[in-house]
């Protein structure tokens, strides 16, 4: 690490897996990575072909949007345009198990959202995920299961069809299994109730 780098060192096998995942993403492939909620399926979120590959692996309808994961909030604002209130919310809850819906810039392709100008932003509270995002991000943030099937909490649960379709799998410990809460701060609407939802509701009420 560079002097002043605040990243936590990873054990050697995990670092090797992370390096393979970065190489795979840069080659246009998808990878499986751990987060604080469930295992995610990540690919270069700025590359329409890579995004399309994620949809294919998950067998996900193209009209269902994908969220995007970033290494930190400043990185996220390079690709999105949050309002002051949305940014205040992000600084309160990110990194964390929350997906915040904000306006996207054109550097994020329409395929991610089926043309919707708004997109979900994640900054995972997981060191492996953060290092992956910083090295290869922004990357897609969607669960590493096929659509309609249970989320993946540990590597042993990963469907073989997904494992065979990705360029790398970063195997780590079992995750919490609770999905992120999806919130549109501009309207105060919670689209999916998940982790930290009570604190989010309190923030929305207090800042209304």
Regions of interest found by a model, annotated:
Residues 1-208:
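Active-site-adjacent structural elements in enzyme catalytic cores
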């Amino acid at each position: 690490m560079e002097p002043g780098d605040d990243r936590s060192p990873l054990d050697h096998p995990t670092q090797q897996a992370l390096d393979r995942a970065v190489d795979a993403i840069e080659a246009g492939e998808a990878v499986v990575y751990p987060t604080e909620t469930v295992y995610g399926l990540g690919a270069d979120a700025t590359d329409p072909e890579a995004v399309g590959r994620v949809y294919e692996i998950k067998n996900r309808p193209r009209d269902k949007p994908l969220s995007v994961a970033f290494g930190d909030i400043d990185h996220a604002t390079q690709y999105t345009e949050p309002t002051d209130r949305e940014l205040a919310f992000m600084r309160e809850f990110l990194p964390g198990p929350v997906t915040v819906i904000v306006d996207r810039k054109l550097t994020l392709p329409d395929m991610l959202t089926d043309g919707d100008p708004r997109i979900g932003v994640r900054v995972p509270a997981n060191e492996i995920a953060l290092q992956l995002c910083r090295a290869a991000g922004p990357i897609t943030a969607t669960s590493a299961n096929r659509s309609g099937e249970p989320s993946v909490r540990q590597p042993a649960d990963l469907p073989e069809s997904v494992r065979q379709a990705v360029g790398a799998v970063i195997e780590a410990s079992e995750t919490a299994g609770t999905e992120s809460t999806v919130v549109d701060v501009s309207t105060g609407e919670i689209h999916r109730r998940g982790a930290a939802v009570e604190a989010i509701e309190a923030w929305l009420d207090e800042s209304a």
